[in-house]
Amino acid sequence: MPYSAPTFSIRTTDVFDAWFAGLPDRVAKRRIQARIDRLSMGNPGDWKSAGSPVVEMRIDHGPGYRVYYVRRGTIWVVLLCGGDKSTQQADIRAAHAMLAHLDME
């Protein structure tokens, strides 16, 4: 019997894109991209709720990188913003604020 894994379309915000592009640590970028790739296949890995519906993807590298995202059905995931453990509370507030103003179409 064939098995079909779910796939999710990943979308990003300009805030996430700017944060990711500005990361100086190439190893961190590769690890974060690998986690995003796994997320697109339905495997979120290490995560924690950041207050429904925002989810915090935890990357155990360097200062403890975080990527905040929201899932919409089985179709796509929006990466809202990123940061690290030192900016965690501000990043969670920013993710919720972005979500309130995000066009989910």
List where the protein language model places each region.
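Enriched for short, Lys/Arg-rich terminal
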Residues: 1-9, 18, 26-29, 44, ...
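PIN/NYN-family metal-dependent endoribonuclease catalytic core
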Residues: 13
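A short, surface-exposed loop/turn module that caps and links secondary-structure elements
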Residues: 34-61
